[in-house]
Design a protein with these regions (language model features):
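A generic structural signal for short, non-catalytic loop/turn and secondary-structure boundary residues
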Residues: 2-5, 25-27, 43, 59, ...
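Pocket-edge structural micro-motifs
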Residues: 14, 34-36, 139
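Glycine-rich loops and low-complexity Gly/Arg-rich segments
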Residues: 37, 57-58, 89-94, 161-164
Length: 176
């Protein structure tokens, strides 16, 4: 199952040189990452990431994301091959009402290649997914949302949708 690796818990205390640089011993944010243990030190498993940043100037002080942000080349190729061969499970996930309500934009286009990946059809109907270099979704919560009584239920619902995506990614990587 999922666990919080030691590196996955963002510390709030800064080192002495950083404290001098930023003027405070404490960071204005804290982050948590949960993932299944990886069998390889080069591959990372899909994860769930939560960031709470009190100093965010855009008002997106709480961020929830999940999926595979920086897949290894082996993982990237496996996911692309799965999408090229059978995009139906991903399409069904993104079309499902709970997932679409949580992540209406689908995969993030933050990390996308300019050209189609080598070995894939330039006319593939899901080329926009094949060009992705990271397979993750994210959403931010405004102050009105994260101060609401039902905020924890909302985050739990969104995290369950991320786990559905992570299962698809894990299956693609494992060749199942």
């Amino acid at each position: 199952g999922y666990h919080f690796p030691r590196r996955g818990l963002g510390g709030i205390k800064r080192s002495a040189p950083r404290a001098q640089e930023y003027g405070s011993f404490y960071r204005g944010y804290v982050s948590f990452t949960a993932a299944k243990p990886s069998k390889s030190r080069f591959d990372h498993n899909p994860s769930v990431f939560l960031l709470i940043n009190s100093e965010d100037e855009d008002g997106d002080e709480v961020l929830l994301s999940g999926g595979l942000y920086m897949p290894s080349s082996r993982q990237l190729k496996a996911i692309r091959e799965r999408i090229a061969a059978n995009p139906a499970p991903f399409e069904a996930l993104f079309r499902s009402k709970p997932f679409a309500r949580s992540f209406p934009d689908g995969f993030s286009t933050e990390r996308i290649a300019t050209r189609p990946p080598r070995g894939f059809d330039r006319e593939h109907p899901y080329l926009h997914w094949l060009k992705l270099q990271g397979f993750f979704v994210w959403r931010s919560y405004r102050r009105k949302e994260y101060t609401a009584v039902d905020f924890f239920d909302r985050v739990a619902c969104d995290a369950r949708q991320i786990l559905r995506l992570n299962e698809l990614l894990e299956n693609a990587i494992a060749g199942r």
